[in-house]
Swiss-Prot record:
Assigned protein family: Belongs to the class-I aminoacyl-tRNA synthetase family.
Cofactor: Zn(2+)
Source organism phylogeny: Archaea, Methanobacteriati, Methanobacteriota, Methanomada group, Methanococci
Alphabetically ordered keywords of this record: Aminoacyl-tRNA synthetase, ATP-binding, Cytoplasm, Ligase, Metal-binding, Nucleotide-binding, Protein biosynthesis, Zinc
Protein's name in the database: Cysteine--tRNA ligase
Native species: Methanococcus aeolicus (strain ATCC BAA-1280 / DSM 17508 / OCM 812 / Nankai-3)
Amino acid sequence: MKIYNTASKNKETFKTINNKKLIKMYVCGPTVYDHAHLGHGRTYVAFDIIRRYLEHKNYIVQLIINFTDIDDKIINRANEQGTTIKELSDKFINSFLEDMEKLNVKPALIYPRVSEHINEIIEFIKVLEKKGYAYATADGVYFDTSKYEKYGELRKINIKEETSEQKNININKKNQRDFALWKFAKPDEPKWDSPWGEGRPAWHIECSAMSLKYLGDNFDIHGGGCDLIFPHHENEKAQSECYTDKKWVNYWIHTGFVMVNNEKMSKSLGNFSTLKDLFEKYSAELIRFFLLERHYSSPLDYTEDAINHSKNNLDKLYNTIQNITVAFRNSEIKYKLNEIDKNTIETIHNCTEKFYTAMDDNFNTAQALKYVFEVSTAINKYINNYANSDELPNYSIILKSYEFFKMVGEIFGIFGSSTINTATNTNIAEENLINILMELRADLKKEKNYNLSDKIRDKLKEMDIILEDSPKGTIWKKA
């Protein structure tokens, strides 16, 4: 399996720490001053699929997603709304978790809050200061980037050129590239005691301290949106490797932007759609499917046409699953395979291998999805081949297709509204009742009691059970 590592700008063969089956993953969480938008959704759906695939390959994934609940934006929004920082943060943390649940994003192991890790942050800064990497000024404590030779490595920037272009000069800094670790308190802001004076943590130090506490001084995967590469992840990397004197993260993974009219979707530009707004127009599963149709690192254009295109694709797959469900009840075990049986089995086998190859190639969901549709086409053709035949489909082939779609659903986190997890939306008692009603309807038709037989058909339709008559008899399926 290969993963594109932002640090090396190359795909690298994935190896866990000490080749163990445990994977430690830290994904930067939201700053909780507003509802999550589609860009957030993309990041956490992408890492959820990465996690699901790793778990499918029998890894144990320890996922940490933090909440930044101390920030200028939160302070300003709380003042605007006349509420406390705690109340505002709690509101939007709960909102975020609700959105993730709807998107079928599996919960993280821990969701640490910055406000609950002040002591760890202070201790982290004290170590940096003791080692000579941090210095106090009139307005806070800063990290000295000149002491870290690898600064700029993640973004691949020329520090001297970038520094010379700096426009906002802070006279308190030794170097304009230096960044804050601790900010001294301003009136009416949250503050904590520290060796340097009352204040609050700066942004970048938060994730370094919390990841150290929960994942240790070296972990497998650190991720987030590509807008975090610089300055956030660059600064995290600098302070963490100076703290630990070793490589901090083995693989850096970043998701691409969601674009609207060729601009990044963001709150600062005001061109964003919250997930809650989108859920009023589309199903959460459709949003998730829309997000996975493109590779996680590619820009994703959000338009209504694109969403509708995704809906058509998802509907096609649901139709296939419905056909498989019906075929389960109308197939038979055969010990000899005919030519179409052999071709269909070969297609399912080959596409399964190609699906895994695509996912092993930097979690390429877009490529993997092509093979899902290839199986969909093949199994529909196979089932339709028997529609007007006296023979029934081979049960083992229907089972193979069912297992394929079940695997895809588990990895992609989709098909939750389908029959794929149980092969039927009905329990055994309901299925038996439907079969009894179908037999009764058949008897009524033989007696030419069409009014009553049609009434049974119509009543079942009201219950979302569709009856389809064919030369081989009547079959039923969910609407």
